[in-house]
C-alpha cells in the first residue's frame, strides 16, 4: 500500500521549514506587497521549502502593518506555506545593529507593540535585545500572546540572558552573529551572550550554516553542545 515515487535518481526528503527568511527570487518581504511576498515564497518553494516565516528587519510601524496585512491575507489561502510573520527588530542594541537600519532601532515601547500584537495575530516571532530597558516586560507580554521571543543583535551577558529566559526568551537568532562571546573588562572576565545561551539548556538556537557566518568548526561545537533538537 506504499506510494511509489519515481525520483529519477534524486532523493525524496521532508520539505524544509524556513524559520528566518528575508526574501528570495528578487522579492523582499520588507516591501510588504503581495507581489514581493509571492515572488520570494515561490522562489523558496521551487527549492524544497514547504513552510516559511517571512522575516522583516527593523521596520517602522507602517511597514510592519503593511507586511502583516499581506501576511494575514496570504495565510488565509488554501494550503498556504506561510506559518507566521517574524519580526527581527526593531528593539535591538544599536551597537550590534549590523545590517539593520539604525534609524528604526529603539527601546521596547508598550504603547507601540501592544497595538501591533493585538491587531495582527499573524506575528509568531519577535526578536529583541534583552538588556534594553523594557525588554523583560516586552518578552513576558509577547510570550503570553503565543509569540516566540528570541534574543538578537545584543550585548547581553549571563544575568541578562538568565533573566530573559525567565521572562520568556527561549530562542537565539543567528547564534554567534551580532552577539559577543567571552570577553574581559580590565582584569575581569565575563560570559558573553554566546556562553550564556549555552548555559540555558532549554534555549534553542538557529545558525547561519553557510560556513561563512559561522565556520565549520564552530558549527560542530554548536551541534555537540545543543544537539539536533535545540
Give residue ranges: language-model regions.
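Divalent metal-binding pocket/active-site signature
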Residues: 87, 94-110, 115-191
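Active-site loop-to-helix "anion-binding N-cap" substructures in soluble metabolic enzymes
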Residues: 27-31, 43, 57-63, 131, ...
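Surface-exposed amphipathic alpha-helices with a cationic face
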Residues: 72-75, 139-146, 223
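Active-site-adjacent C-terminal substructures of enzyme catalytic domains
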Residues: 160-230
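Di-metal (Zn2+ and/or Mg2+/Mn2+) metal-binding site signature of metallo-dependent hydrolases
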Residues: 10-32
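Histidine-rich, glycine-flanked metal-binding segment
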Residues: 1-13
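Charged helix-capping and loop-helix junction motifs
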Residues: 33-36, 67-70, 109-111, 186-193
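Divalent metal-dependent hydrolysis catalytic cores, especially in the metallo-beta-lactamase
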Residues: 22, 38-67, 80-93, 120-131, ...
Amino acid at each position: 500500500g506504499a506510494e511509489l515515487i519515481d525520483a529519477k535518481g534524486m532523493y525524496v526528503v521532508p520539505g524544509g521549514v524556513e524559520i528566518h527568511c528575508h526574501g528570495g527570487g528578487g522579492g523582499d518581504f520588507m516591501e510588504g506587497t503581495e507581489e514581493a511576498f509571492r515572488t520570494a515564497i515561490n522562489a523558496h518553494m521551487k527549492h524544497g521549502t514547504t513552510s516559511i516565516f517571512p522575516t522583516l528587519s527593523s521596520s517602522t510601524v507602517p511597514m510592519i502593518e503593511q507586511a502583516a496585512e499581506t501576511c494575514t491575507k496570504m495565510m488565509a489561502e488554501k494550503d498556504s506555506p506561510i506559518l507566521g510573520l517574524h519580526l527581527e527588530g526593531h528593539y535591538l542594541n544599536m551597537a550590534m545593529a549590523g545590517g539593520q537600519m539604525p534609524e528604526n532601532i529603539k527601546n521596547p515601547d508598550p504603547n507601540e507593540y501592544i497595538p501591533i500584537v493585538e491587531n495582527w495575530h499573524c506575528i509568531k516571532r519577535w526578536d529583541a535585545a534583552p538588556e534594553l530597558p523594557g525588554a523583560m516586560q516586552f518578552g513576558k507580554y509577547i510570550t503570553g500572546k503565543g509569540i516566540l521571543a528570541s534574543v538578537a543583535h545584543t550585548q547581553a551577558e549571563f544575568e541578562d540572558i538568565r533573566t530573559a529566559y525567565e521572562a520568556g526568551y527561549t530562542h537565539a537568532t543567528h547564534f554567534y552573529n551580532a552577539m559577543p562571546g567571552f570577553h574581559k573588562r580590565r582584569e575581569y572576565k565575563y560570559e558573553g551572550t554566546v556562553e550564556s545561551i549555552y548555559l540555558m539548556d532549554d534555549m534553542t538556537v538557529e545558525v547561519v550554516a553557510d560556513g561563512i557566518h559561522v565556520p565549520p568548526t564552530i558549527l560542530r561545537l554548536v551541534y555537540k553542545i545543543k544537539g539536533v533538537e535545540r
